């Protein structure tokens, strides 16, 4: 988990350096929601989807796609959001 948090911080910083406002719900919601409680995890996912609806783009980093990322990508495609893909080194592919 700590490795994922560090990566999310790096990717968020990269977005700022590119002139964007990063939104990383998985950094915010675990501060006050219990990710091991199924009801609270679902609430966090719902909140994340609500926030994503306000974004102009969805950025995907890395080659490993978790189940949560897969769900977000599927939703973004379904909603017609612009997806951008990057390597772990923040190189767009």
Language model features by range: what are they?
Residues 1-93:
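Catalytic phosphate/metal-binding cores of nucleic-acid and nucleotide-processing enzymes, i.e., regions
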């Amino acid at each position: 988990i700590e490795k994922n948090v560090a990566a999310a911080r790096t990717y968020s910083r990269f977005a700022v350096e590119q002139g964007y406002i990063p939104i990383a719900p998985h950094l915010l919601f675990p501060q006050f929601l219990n990710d091991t409680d199924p009801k609270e995890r679902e609430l966090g996912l719902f909140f994340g989807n609500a926030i994503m609806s306000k974004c102009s783009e969805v950025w995907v980093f890395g080659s490993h796609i978790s189940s949560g990322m897969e769900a977000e990508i599927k939703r973004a495609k379904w909603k017609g959001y612009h997806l951008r893909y990057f390597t772990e080194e923040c190189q767009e592919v």
